Amino acid sequence: MGNKRINLSGKLIIHRTLVIMNQKKEILEKLAFIRRHKEFASFGVKEQEVSYNPCLSEEDIKEFEHKHCITLPDDYRTFISEIGNGGFGPGYGLLPLDKAIVDFKLRDKPNISLNEKFPYQDSWNEEWITSFNWDEGYPETEIVDAYISTSHIAGSLQISHFGHGCTFLLVVNGNEKGHIWFDGRADYSGLVPKLKDGQRISFIEWYVTFLDMEIENINESLTNSTTA
């Protein structure tokens, strides 16, 4: 029995290594295509460097996990250790790990508490937002401060700034761990899980979908330019 367990473990490690290598190859090939045809990409992509930051070492990642009493989702962990610690991506790009814990849109730039569980499992927004009379002004500061508090996004990383203070979140603690959410509180639209075909999506699914959409846009632009 002992030998069988060792062999199975070895096969799982080999399989996981092959999956990682294939994903890395696929992502880098797609990145290279986008880089070659950047002039045909969407506006947000044109404003970015089509490259990645240096990877984090295993020691750096373990230190981060130990400090915050979490383990990062496997696909994201692999990405920052094998492909890059931030760089080209949705919105204004992927934020590096050390910046993803800082809520940059708040004046005092507080850290997000990762050792607390992400508080939501379904889409959330405050009820007062739909009943508030926006023609008469804005809510009181205390109400807004409570609404945009980092307590609503505890247990998540702000991995990408979409624009206007809205961000993409990767949940790293709680029932939604590993899933991507959209934080639209800067536009008073609350917190919403990202879905694909009605299902929650992981970091790597979200990221590869972004690359595929950009490639589709480029191919369409290339086709239009040759037929014009």
What is the predicted role of each segment?
Residues 83, 97, 160-162, 171-173, ...:
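Structured loops at beta-to-helix junctions and adjacent beta-edge loops in soluble globular domains
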Residues 190-228:
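Long, compositionally biased interface segments
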Residues 167-201:
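Segments surrounding the PLD/"HKD" phosphodiesterase catalytic module and close analogs
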Residues 20-151, 155-158, 222-226:
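A surface-exposed partner-binding patch
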Residues 152-155, 162-166, 175-176:
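Short, well-ordered loop/turn elements at secondary-structure boundaries
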